Amino acid sequence: MSTKVKKCREPARVTLPAPEEEDGEAEGAEPQRRRRGWRGVNGGLEPPCPRAPPSPGPDASSEGSPSRWRTAGMRDKGRRQAVRGPAFMFGARGPSLTAEEERFLDAAEYGNIPVVRKMLEESRTLNVNCVDYMGQNALQLAVGNEHLEVTELLLKKENLARIGDALLLAISKGYVRIVEAILGHPGFAASRRLTLSPCEQELRDDDFYAYDEDGTRFSPDITPIILAAHCHKYEVVHLLLLKGARIERPHDYFCRCADCAEKQRLDAFSHSRSRINAYKGLASPAYLSLSSEDPVLTALELSNELAKLANIEKEFKNDYRKLSMQCKDFVVGVLDLCRDSEEVEAILNGDLESVEPLERHGHKASLSRVKLAIKYEVKKFVAHPNCQQQLLTIWYENLSGLREQTIAIKCLVVLVVALGLPFLAIGYWIAPCSRLGKILRSPFMKFVAHAASFIIFLGLLVFNASDRFEGITTLPNITVIDYPKQIFRVKTTQFTWTEMLIMVWVLGMMWSECKELWLEGPREYIVQLWNVLDFGMLSIFIAAFTARFLAFLQATKAQQYVDSHVQESDLSEVTLPPEVQYFTYARDKWLPSDPQIISEGLYAIAVVLSFSRIAYILPANESFGPLQISLGRTVKDIFKFMVLFIMVFLAFMIGMFILYSYYLGAKVNPAFTTVEESFKTLFWSIFGLSEVTSVVLKYDHKFIENIGYVLYGIYNVTMVVVLLNMLIAMINSSYQEIEDDSDVEWKFARSKLWLSYFDDGKTLPPPFSLVPSPKSFVYFIMRITNFSKCRRRRLQKDLELGMGNSKSRLNLFTQSNSRVFESHSFNSILNQPTRYQQIMKRLIKRYVLKAQVDKENDEVNEGELKEIKQDISSLRYELLEDKSQATEELAILIHKLSEKLNPSALRCE
């Protein structure tokens, strides 16, 4: 086979049957035409081997000239080999192209501006919408190779199709100038041209987008602005936003509207993919930066929405999590670009000027964005140095100099506050607006006061049990009374002074929790697990004291009966009614449901929960904070593990009980003979405290005994070797995750603790918070007054807006809002932007510039080299065209000159 035939097949990159030998000896004329013009022969494809060209004569066209062959050979070795070469997977349905169309597509692909211009101007039979076997027309080929001049020439044709496809291609490659040229086409003047997806426009429109049944380069639901957002093309997104393009946020996942139901019914997968594509566009930093008036708030809310979708749509969990993290990184990136405290405060507080004065009155630093970031667990944003520095400044507010003091000085301050807490509370009640009041209202002092109050509460709990540290003097079967007619239960149910103080503290803490529940709302209150722990602890305390009080009331009634009906001095000689006699019994004869017994059990649980609440203040310390976080994560792992543990435990507990339930009294020990004994044996065997003889029978029933040995052995292997080691591995993994990012985790937990003391209120800790201060009454009256004033102002404004002389102002405001909707760009969001909007505009400019610089630094040189090659290719064709024109002009001049010099010779001829 000849070399030329191999060269002919090589660009097509398909495997073809070997042609006849005489075909291989042919030399290729018009190689480009043969390379493109494939025809079906006998149901197959005709191999792209050129037939022997006709011998060039004096009248041969330029297409058959050797220079034409060389040009075609160079193109065969060019950068787009086999682009239009067919392959069997595309079938034989591709349209046949004429020589003119072949030449036109070649010129558009390689940037031959003179040829394209000439054919568009002179040719009458040229089909500008002709496509190659891949379905690409001349406009797409020109756009794909970044030939701006060719694109502009093609866009001047009135009947040009698939302009939308070319726009998507230009956006994907980042050709901004070509995008501008295409957007200037009259076809984009139609309403909603940029907002509808190609699939929707194909159903209601012409061939602005042309999608075949085999699919194309882009998904049918991709709009130009979605694609630009996916590719992070800031300039393109800006252009499209100016044209009115927007990304519509998908409906809620559980939406049951007619549109969503129809899409879900037709193709659930396509519906899900279209939602992901839309969210990818919405979560793009380019779209967030340029489309939103408040990008930080938009990104925070979108990150939370995407995190929820990750838990709902499990099949696309990783995609949604990645997008959620992308939104969080955007917020952190904007915060990182702050250069002064004003910019940091703007991001952390949000637009305070848009908040009502009544809501803004409380504290100058609302920290609304920080609260939102904590709620949505944007940990890197909260732990960022810029945010932490601002929070630390607020933490030591009104305490100048304490921030720079040593730990010893701070500990001394804590001790002084703890010892002088009652006096500080009295001083605050008397003069809440004095210097002392301002100091006590600082977040640090509020934290110290509450911590000191809680430590005093724990001290009371310990002191209440101190009389029993070395044991009790009265045995459970002995009753001790103060005087002969006294009922024993009256003595045991009386409240001591320490218990009364504990009750006062509990009431104070419950009052604080109720106020917090009222201010935050039930939903926000329950989300914080510490609130659930506090409420549960206090509820158990109240239940314990209530049961104790009921027992005291019953004993008091019995004592009243004795005092009024019994005349004897010794109750042991008197027959009392059963309901009264019961209260004279010793502890060993009390019923299990006795209120005092229930009270003591609940009180013990509440004490345990009270001491566990110390972990709430541990994040304030850098050493103990990460440990507390690891402990919390470990508890979560244990709860997850308990599901599998309980399943295995119940299986073996019931199985062993069924096996040995018939052998009660016939075993070495009572293990597994009852459900209770089965539970005890299996539970303590986890810690190695159960004996192997638990399965041994006194009878010679070896089969049952052997089954017991096997089941007991399998249980120990499963629980001890497998499940417990799995739990240890889970705990180790969780601890390692915290340790790897301990600084961020600790700062996030510390910020949550700090933030609970930043808001106004909670100045005095329990139980001092039970007594309302004069300031509370003043603030209550001020709030009522401000509320009535604001309501009067709103009514007055409504009346003014309803009058005819204010219609012009209303129209101006409406026009301003419409301009805001049409251009979310760098220019001006409002005619008179607020200070917050000015700062956000400045930060977004920095972010966009930084993103563009980073992209330029990350770009590979291959793209630049390709662009240079394409420019050189276009320049080559222009130079060749200029050379051809110069040659023709020179030939004409020579001919005219020869006519003048040799007129006689020409006449003779």
UniProtKB/Swiss-Prot annotation:
Glycans are attached at N477. InterPro entries: Ankyrin_rpt, Ankyrin_rpt-contain_sf, Ion_trans_dom, TRP_dom, TRPC3_channel, TRPC_channel. Residues 1-447, 516-528, 619-637, 728-909 are cytoplasmic. It catalyses: Ca(2+)(in) = Ca(2+)(out). Residues 58-67 have a biased composition (Low complexity). Residues 1-92 are annotated as: Disordered. One of its GO terms (cellular component) is cation channel complex. The chain crosses the membrane at residues 448-465, 497-515, 529-550, 595-618, 638-661, 702-727. Activated by diacylglycerol (DAG) in a membrane-delimited fashion, independently of protein kinase C. Activated by inositol 1,4,5-triphosphate receptors (ITPR) with bound IP3. May be activated by internal calcium store depletion. Inhibited by intracellular Ca(2+). Residues 466-496, 551-594, 662-701 are extracellular. ANK repeats lie at residues 99-128, 134-163, 165-191, 220-249, 622-651. The keyword Flavoprotein does not apply. GO terms for biological process: calcium ion transmembrane transport; positive regulation of calcium ion transport into cytosol; positive regulation of cardiac muscle hypertrophy in response to stress; regulation of cytosolic calcium ion concentration; response to ATP; response to calcium ion; single fertilization. Its main location: membrane. Keywords: ANK repeat, Calcium, Calcium channel, Calcium transport, Cell membrane, Glycoprotein, Ion channel, Ion transport, Membrane, Metal-binding, Repeat, Transmembrane, Transmembrane helix, Transport. It comes from the Eukaryota. Ca(2+) 2 binds at E513, E516, N531. PANTHER family: SHORT TRANSIENT RECEPTOR POTENTIAL CHANNEL 3, TRANSIENT RECEPTOR POTENTIAL CHANNEL. This is Short transient receptor potential channel 3. The gene is Trpc3.
